[in-house]
């Protein structure tokens, strides 16, 4: 997997099982994870690779630019990325864009909200605007 995709799947996606392990253990740091939710991570990873726009054996040759093109042309319906990619996908129209949580099968996760991978996140209440 090239560097343009590496961070999405080995960093951001991996944050989900690590978050739940930290939450269960009541910790915010550790030298080594136990791997409590690694099977959940594997299942979401398998869902990704077995439903990609290319064969799993071809994934190592694909880049973030390929993923963007697949999404913009309608070959892909889901596209895991951040707001910084908006300029590259805005031509599909705002009515065709949305945010979807990534569930990995942990009890209660439907109440957690959207995971973000950013240093800064501003949220304003509609009533305060």
Identify the function of each model-found stretch.
Residues 73-81, 95:
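Alpha-to-beta junction loops
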Residues 29-61:
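Glycine-centered hinge/linker elements that transmit conformational signals in sensory
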Residues 1-30, 76:
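Extracytoplasmic/periplasmic solute-binding protein
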């Amino acid at each position: 997997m090239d560097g343009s995709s590496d961070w999405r799947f080995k960093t951001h996606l991996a944050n989900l099982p690590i978050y739940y392990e930290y939450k269960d253990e009541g910790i915010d740091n550790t030298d080594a994870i136990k791997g409590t939710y690694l099977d959940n991570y594997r299942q979401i990873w398998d869902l990704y690779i077995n439903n990609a726009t290319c064969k799993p054996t071809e994934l190592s040759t694909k880049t973030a630019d390929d993923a963007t093109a697949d999404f913009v042309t309608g070959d892909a319906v889901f596209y895991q990325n951040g707001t910084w990619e908006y300029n590259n996908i805005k031509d599909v129209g705002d009515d065709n864009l949305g945010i979807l949580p990534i569930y990995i099968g942990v009890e209660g996760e439907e109440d957690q909200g959207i995971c973000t991978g950013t240093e800064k996140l501003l949220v304003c209440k509609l009533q305060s605007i």
